[in-house]
Regions:
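Secretory targeting signatures
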Residues: 1-31
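Extracytoplasmic metal-acquisition and chelation regions
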Residues: 23-312
Length: 312
């Protein structure tokens, strides 16, 4: 009997110890989360940039969620409430339509928040002159539709070399609001920059140096194309569907260059792309420039482009 009582007491003591340990671990985890700095970003790729540098020392508020378009998204009440607690807002800063519309309004919600322009130091690509003229002629309509890029291409992050600059700017913002962790941020930033260099090398090895052409519905890939010597042919221009004459021109160009893949993204209509693909005996392939897992997504994009680019 005494042996049974001792056994029961031993088991009870063990259970109490495990339970107490679990409570302590949970308390420490909750405390870590409670002490994390709140920062805001515009797009999902930036979430990886911040988290790779700062780890669990930050909570990231992403203002444009998965599946939403930077041209039309409006922040929710909950997002704006979170921004009110943010120490910093890391903007893309290159004419992103969402920021053009909402940045000043967001600043009024939290006047003490540090605003970091992550495109500082990046050479911004101007739109083609004819595109800019179209924009000026229909400025009011395009602004209402959310497609006013202010004459520049906002998709700077699609080039991993530009992403490195964005990461540097993110790091500088983080050490400004949290200098006590600057060494931790520096080590993580340097490690992530090496990952981006490795991704860039893989892209160059995969795509080669011969150049080539590809066709895409929305002009999201200009910086990627420029980085790797590619010619991007765009179906949509400044938020407008192609006219019948433009459709025929695109079909003729695709046939001339033996293009068999039309790239689209989930945030936009695929109707025109599917019509062109049908005419040229090609296929429509979805690639997402706004995916959260930036480096993993670069590998997916590169694989897709390696099959969709036609060499000169």
């Amino acid at each position: 009997m005494n042996k049974n009582i001792k056994l029961i007491l031993s088991i009870f003591t063990l259970l109490v110890a495990v339970s107490t340990s679990g409570c302590i671990d949970q308390t420490e985890e909750n405390s870590s989360q409670d002490n994390a700095i709140v920062v805001a970003v515009s797009i999902l790729p930036q979430q990886e940039f911040v988290e790779k540098i700062a780890g669990d020392r930050v909570n990231v508020v992403v203002l444009i969620p998965p599946g939403a378009s930077p041209a039309t998204h409006e922040p929710t009440t909950g997002q704006l409430r979170d921004v009110a607690d943010a120490r910093a807002y890391f903007t893309v800063g290159s004419g992103l339509p969402f920021e053009n519309v909402w940045l000043e309004k967001i600043e009024t919600i939290n006047e003490d928040m540090l605003i970091v322009d992550c495109s500082e130091g990046i050479q911004i690509i101007e739109m083609h002159e004819e595109e800019h003229e179209e924009e000026q002629n229909a400025e009011e309509n395009e602004a209402e539709a959310g497609h006013d890029h202010g004459g520049v291409d906002p998709h700077v992050w699609t080039s991993p070399m530009n992403a490195k600059i964005m990461v540097e700017n993110t790091y500088l913002g983080l050490i400004e609001i949290d200098p006590d962790n600057s060494e931790f941020y520096l080590q993580n930033k340097e490690a992530y920059l090496k990952e981006l260099d490795e991704a860039d090398a893989t892209i160059r090895d995969t795509l080669g140096e011969e150049g080539g052409s590809f066709m895409t519905y929305h002009p999201s890939w200009n910086y990627f194309a420029t980085e790797y010597g590619l010619d991007m042919i765009t179906i949509e221009e400044e938020g407008k569907e192609p006219s019948p004459r433009d459709m025929q021109r695109l079909i003729d160009e695709a046939e001339e260059k033996n293009i068999k893949v039309i790239f689209v993204q989930a945030q936009f209509s695929t109707q025109s792309a599917e019509a062109i693909a049908s005419e040229i005996g090609g296929e429509v392939v979805t690639v997402d420039p706004l995916a959260k897992d930036y480096i993993d997504n670069l590998a997916i994009i590169t694989e897709a482009f390696s099959h969709g680019i036609t060499k000169e």
